[in-house]
Amino acid sequence: MPVADIEMVTGSAGHVDSKAASEYGTDLRRWRLKVHEGRHMWEYVDEDVAQTQQQTFAENYWLGQEYELPKMSTPIFAQDALDNGWAFFKRLQTQDGHWGCHDDGPLFVTSGIVISSYICGITLPDAMKNEMIRYLLNFVNEDGGWGLWINSPSTVFGTTMNYTMLRILGVPSTHPALLDARDTLLKMGSARALPTWGKFWMCALGAYEWDGMIPLAPEPLLAPGFLPLNPGNWWVHTRNVFVSMSYLFGHRFSAPMTPLIQELREELYDMPYHKIDWFAQQTNISDYDRLHPPTMLQKGLANALCYYEYVKVPYLRRKALDEALFQVEMEVHNTSYLCIAPVSFASNMLVMFHAHGANSHWVKGMADRIIDPMWMCREGMAASGTNGTSVWDTALTVQAALDGGLAQRPENHNTMLEALKFIEVSQITENPLGVSQGYRQPTKGAWPFSTRDQAYAVSDTTAVTVRAVIQLQALKSMPKLVSDERLAEAVDLIIGMENKCDGYSAFEPLRGPKALELLNITELYDNVMTESLYPECTSSVLLCLDTFTKAYPHHRPVEIQSIMARCARYLIKAQFPCGGWLASWGVCFTYATMFALQGLETVGLRESNSETCRNACSFLLQYQNDDGGWGEDLISIREKRYIQDPAGSQVTCTAYALMGLISAHCSNRDALRRGIRWLMRAQQATGEWLPGSLEGIFACPGGMRYPNYKFHFTLSAIGRYIERYGDEALYLKEQ
């Protein structure tokens, strides 16, 4: 057909700013995304640059602007939907070969960075500040407050942190949005009722008194490593946050008084600041924030920590503070100033500011990294839960292309080659400095979740990437960029991450007993004191080892077969009585059940020969909606049972369920057809699928967005369906 006859269609993310948010919007035409080896840097360019350097399709898409594409033909066959979806998604590949996006959701990550930057005297660009304001005003609740994550009920923590952030960014206290927020905050008990995490940030800012929070003594860092009390045995994120918080608590560090801080002291409380009984606030935690009432053991721990502050030994305190500083320095050094995540990045930057000063390479290096977790979403700018998802999303995308037979096509050669190049440069080639002293897991050979600079080994990211690389490099058209030795090194690292009790965790094997959770005084989250066993990580390892041992049958075959058997044994034990598995990183039962059934397929278990798989299929089929799709609510993670999404069927949940059923060789072919048909109906004329409910989880019960999940898991589901059952006409206009 002549070019002039090609019918174009307009697409967009469908976002409209709230009236308050629109006041702070920047000129979206001037935003550009710079990338380098997975690193993201959104930059607001001058007008003349904007005129000469056109925005890419990916920039347009993520900014939520309208774009024009050739109209795709209405899919009749499953292959049509697969081709249309891939044609759209491949356009989102960045110049360095990866697929990137935001993984935002928690509403205290950006505010922590903004507060820390303010204290350290770091000036953020005006465009960045305005877009941060726009983001928050787009996500404000109807009552004027903010919750723990986007679209969650207002809490004292969320409202205080984001009110404070908006004031720092320049929004006046008389702004209608802040008047509403303050009214809601006072109704919930004011900032006096902050949970410990919020009290910490307000203390560091000088808008709360250290006497008002449960002490965070750094002395556990001096405990022998074999004792569970030593933070080296805690979950890696909890450990990193605790170390920096305990350092700042031990020094009673607070920012110098400024007019703004004085104003916040007046605005955040329901009584004059100087009249507050700060010691009485230690146990004053709002019911809007508490996940559970405190146990007697937790109350006893809090009392013991308070008593210890009166009898502490000065020598031990100094030694503990030195150790805390050493740990933070190790973390900042080993991650090229990034830290494991933006949450601990913010508090670690304050530690470096206190210990070394604003002009030190520590603070300057971290200041240069503030941009890394920031993403220009369609609602504005916010920090993600990590410095991106670059390796994870790219490996999953390559796998989707392989599952659908797309990677083999000549027209996709360059796309796959660039992805392989990115994956190759992203492998971690050395261990962190001071592995044992810094409580680190070896990393040589691993692939990280985000970028090589971040430098944390993750079991499932490494497993998914190894599998994708082996299959991609098996294509005749692909060069062998990742050597056999490097793949073997990655598998050796995975083998070393197995838990003694079977199964896999994410960052490191279990180090502490689950009884540590009894001492959880975060008030906000469940199951955050130690690492956990995850069906999704365990299944990813199974899929990886199955692929690896077929390609390299002589590399540690006995060990690999033993590990695969133990992983399968763990999955069978981890199944819930309802028939599903519960995820910790995605929503929720459908996500984990997808992975579990894929993992069990590698050891020959399916619906026809396994009661475990039969029960899982029955579980998934039970929750298929009348329209053919699946839709699970994030609240399932908290309730520990499947909860239907009130918004109805979701693209991601439908893809998860289909992947699981296909892997189990489910005999209910009609259910599979109806699921694929629903995905085809949900596809837009551009080939894309639109955003839906939150796709991910950080820690129970908090939600996150993983916007690429609706693409690569959906493409994998359709591709695997075609591979298993063949292509067929599934969607007719009259249906």
From Swiss-Prot:
Q: Lipid metabolism: present as a keyword of the record?
A: yes
> Which InterPro entries does the record associate with it?
SQ_cyclase_C, SQ_cyclase_N, Squalene_cyclase, Terpenoid_cyclase/PrenylTrfase
Q: Which cysteines are joined by disulfide bonds?
A: none
EC no. given is 5.4.99.32
Q: Name one GO biological process term.
A: ergosterol biosynthetic process
One Pfam annotation, family name? SQHop_cyclase_C
- Domain of life of the organism encoding this protein: Eukaryota
Entries under SUPFAM superfamilies matching the protein: Terpenoid cyclases/Protein prenyltransferases (SSF48239)
Name the Gene Ontology molecular function terms of this record. Answer: lanosterol synthase activity
**Residues at the catalytic site:** 460
Lipid metabolism recorded as keyword: yes
Family stated for the protein in its record? Belongs to the terpene cyclase/mutase family.
Describe the task this protein carries out.
Protostadienol synthase which cyclizes (3S)-oxidosqualene to (17Z)-protosta-17(20),24-dien-3-beta-ol (protostadienol), the biosynthetic precursor of helvolic acid, a secondary metabolite which promotes virulence.
Name of the protein in question: Protostadienol synthase A
Q: Which organism is it from?
A: Arthroderma gypseum (strain ATCC MYA-4604 / CBS 118893) (Microsporum gypseum)
